[in-house]
Curated annotation (Swiss-Prot):
Source organism (scientific name): Streptococcus thermophilus (strain ATCC BAA-250 / LMG 18311)
Names of the cofactor(s): Mg(2+); Mn(2+)
HAMAP family named among the record's database cross-references: Glut_biosynth
Protein name: Glutathione biosynthesis bifunctional protein GshAB
Pathway annotation: Sulfur metabolism; glutathione biosynthesis; glutathione from L-cysteine and L-glutamate: step 1/2; Sulfur metabolism; glutathione biosynthesis; glutathione from L-cysteine and L-glutamate: step 2/2
PROSITE patterns attached to this UniProt entry: ATP_GRASP
Residues noted as binding ATP in the record, renumbered to the chain: 515-573
Length: 754
């Protein structure tokens, strides 16, 4: 079967860039002095027996971060960024991730084999330590996984003379593997980033600096007698099987090639079930990147892989691959500033890249990538290993690496309430995703704009919207809670205290009600909105003008409006999950405190500068506005936004204390009497709600609440209650909610970890 010139036959509009990607990143845990740690793998990361994203490689201190399959290089890096964020915030606070492929200074006896549950995996690692030594096992890197797109493969198949798709794909991936190994020196030259080994790593003297220790024969390679042919897939499979039978290898995965066929559990299955994708294993960690690999590297490698498919297969595969290995070794061992040797036929690569880009009409971005490759071929200063040279001090990169590790650690803890790469999602969803990754629950974002997730563990699938809307709530429950009139009736029927009042569907009806409430304290609010929108509170009797303004504000949010009695006391939010109160929050209305110098408008701006404040529920606290509601509130107190407040004078900008309208959050879970927590839970249960926010007005929290004498009034129940405000509070310890959501959805994971 010949695949030469097949790519050239495709139409220019063919989906040449279509592919699936995955990244595996290895990294060592070290302390803040750059010394290897001896702590066990973090227990908060769940069981390594099933964790899909965070594992340990050879050593107990060597983390392996594994992305899900992504449809683009950008998404793969986004996944890796999030998993790196989770890993960085799951290890001990005095630990960081080492950003280099070569480990810090170490001794063989320091290296502890990963303490895995699987007996074979432990035995396998002990075997490797005995055979290859433990120091080599501490070398880390990046594995770049790629599957050609389904439509691209189909287009190539249609251009071929083949009738068997599995055989065709096997031949396609075999050709890619052959040319990748033939030209692997390109990867070593461009992206090698392990120019030195720290003192004591090798027993013998080795020349340094070099382009890549890891990608030379000084790195993690098989014994010289292990020679596997890539002439055919059958040859490949049979050779490895023979080495295992002879005892030269203990398992198929002990064959350490720069490229590995993937998609089946055993190699022989490739012959009849097919290769699914390729794993390219020869990438050094890029220490200039927090996640170890840059976007341009990902995309350049993608182009190079396609160029390898564009190029013809070698006529003599074994000879070409042997020459490729020798050239790679020469380039890996050479000084980072040494030009490429004459036998490195860069023109073959450049021509293939140019023709590929031209044939498929790829745009400026990919054309620039090709220009960068050409420039690096001409000037070694532009290669990654050369860029590391200025940071070598006394034959060591330890100081540079530690500074980078600490900087990346600090970045992970910046805006620690968010999930890196997913900051545009609603904050509670980000927190749930963080915990899902940490626990080892598979995830897929079905609709990012709609905050819709698919979570699964083994065969158990759950769908989650907005962080806590799940199958545990039936369809009618959120509808009932969205309707404040229905909520009041259900609670009243269950003998729970609710405020009295009436409902209106027009401004005229509401105004006609004024004579009945003109001397009363009242609340005007939309019937069916959440987050405190459109609510006005009058603790003193309202003038007709202010009452009309409040009605207009409420009608701007809904077609029906409630006018209720004002209940004096302090408002608390109770978070109820599955019949149990998990958190209690005191919310203080949006406010400013004067300093005798600045206007109210300026004080609001100062308070909004707090990094915890943001918009659209993507930060723990919300930006304080100075809109109609706030200015009405100021007017009732005799102020305008441009007035200067006396020092120490506190002015509320809202009467409602929702965090979503600029309020402050104070966690009082530990001090709130359990009687109120139980009462709030009973209210949620009466609604049939699984996840629910219960808002209670409590005049005196020292009084014990009972069903007969509740000493409180329920002013609202909220479906899809915010969770972040209970966790990241302005004051108090905070309560983790999203972890409990996941524990309820996947109790088998909790059981498996205890």
């Amino acid at each position: 079967m010949t695949l030469n010139q097949l790519l050239q036959k495709l139409e220019a509009t063919s989906p040449i860039l279509q592919a699936n990607f995955g990244i595996e990143r290895e990294s060592l845990r070290v302390d803040r002095q750059g010394q290897l740690v001896h702590t066990p793998h973090p227990s908060c990361l769940g069981a390594r027996s099933f964790h899909p994203y965070i594992q340990t490689d050879f050593c107990e201190f060597q983390m392996e971060l594994i992305t899900p399959v992504a449809k683009s290089t950008t998404e793969a890096r986004r996944f890796l960024g999030a998993i790196t964020d989770v890993a960085g915030r799951s290890i001990a606070t005095d630990e960081v991730l080492w950003p280099l492929s070569m480990p810090p200074r170490l001794k063989a006896e320091e290296i502890q084999v990963a303490q895995l549950e699987n007996d074979f995996e432990r035995h396998y690692r002990n075997y490797l330590a005995e055979k290859y030594g433990t120091k080599l096992q501490a070398i880390s890197g990046i594995h770049y996984n790629m599957e050609l797109g389904k439509d691209l493969v189909e287009a190539l198949f249609q251009e071929s003379d083949q009738t068997d798709m599995i055989a065709f794909k096997n031949a396609l991936y075999l050709k890619l593997a052959q040319n990748y190994l033939r030209y692997r020196w390109v990867i070593t030259y461009l992206f090698g980033a392990s120019p030195i080994a720290e003192q004591g790593f090798f027993d013998q003297e080795v020349p340094e600096p070099m382009r890549s220790f890891r990608n030379s024969d000084h790195g993690y390679v098989n014994k010289e007698e292990i020679q596997v042919s890539f002439v055919s897939l059958e040859d490949y499979v049979s050779a490895i099987e023979t080495y295992i039978e002879q005892g030269d290898l203990i398992a198929e995965k002990e064959f350490y090639s720069a490229v590995r066929f993937r998609g089946q559990k055993v190699n022989r299955s490739f012959l009849d079930k097919g290769i699914t994708y390729l794993e390219f294993r020869n990438f050094d960690l890029n220490p200039f990147e927090r996640i170890g690999i840059s976007q341009t590297t990902m995309d350049t490698v993608h182009l190079l892989i396609l160029a390898f498919l564009w190029l013809d297969s070698p006529e003599n595969v074994d000879q070409a691959l042997a020459q490729g290995h020798a050239l790679n070794e020469k380039i890996a061992l050479s000084h980072p500033l040494e030009p490429l040797p004459s036998e490195a036929k860069t023109q073959d690569i450049v021509t293939a890249l140019d023709q590929l880009v031209q044939h498929f009409g790829l745009g400026d971005y990919h054309q620039d990538l090709v220009k960068q490759v050409k420039a690096a071929f001409a000037d070694p200063n532009q290669t990654l290993s050369a860029q590391l040279l200025p940071y070598i001090k006394d034959k060591s990169l330890a100081e540079f690496a530690l500074n980078k590790a600490l900087a990346y650690h600090d970045y992970d803890w910046t805006a620690h309430y968010a999930l890196k790469g997913y900051e545009e999602m609603e904050l509670s969803t980000q927190m749930l995703l963080f915990d899902a990754i940490q626990k080892g629950i598979h995830f897929e974002i079905l609709d990012e704009q709609d905050q819709f997730l698919k979570l699964w563990h083994q065969d158990h699938v759950e769908y989650v919207k907005n962080g806590n809307m799940t199958s545990k709530d039936n369809y009618v429950v959120p509808l009932a809670m969205a309707n404040k009139t229905v909520t009041k009736k259900i609670l009243a029927d269950a003998s729970f205290p609710v405020p009295s009042g009436d409902e209106f569907t027009s401004l005229e009806e509401g105004l006609a009600y004024y004579p009945l409430i003109k001397d009363k304290q009242i609340v005007v609010k939309p019937k069916s909105t959440n987050f405190g929108l459109g609510i006005s509170i009058f603790q003193e009797p309202a003038s007709l003008d202010n009452y009309q303004k409040a009605l207009e504000i409420a009608f701007a949010e809904d077609t029906s409006v409630l006018v209720e009695e004002f209940i004096p006391g302090t408002e608390y939010r109770f978070f109820i999950l599955d019949g149990r109160c998990e958190a209690v929050l005191l919310r203080v209305a949006a406010n400013v405190i004067g300093d005798g110098k600045h206007t109210i408008r300026e004080l609001v701006a100062q308070k909004n500068a707090n990094p915890l404040r943001g918009r659209d529920h993507r930060s723990p606290l919300e930006i304080i506005e100075l809109g109609d509601i706030e200015q009405l509130m100021l007017a009732q107190q005799g102020y305008t936004p441009d007035d200067i407040l006396p020092e120490g004078k506190k002015v509320n900008l809202r009467r409602n204390s929702n965090i979503s309208t600029g309020g402050d959050s104070i966690d009082v879970t530990e001090t709130m009497d359990s009687s109120y927590q139980e009462l709030a839970a009973a209210m949620a249960t009466s609604m049939g709600a699984w996840a629910c926010g219960v808002d209670l007005i409590i005049p005196d929290e020292t009084q014990i609440a009972t069903k007969e004498n509740p000493h409180c009034t329920c002013i609202e129940l909220n479906f899809n209650p915010s969770m972040y405000m209970h966790t990241y509070c302005a004051e108090g310890p905070g309560q983790a909610i999203t972890t409990k959501i996941l524990d309820k959805l996947f109790p088998e994971i909790v059981a498996g970890q205890t």
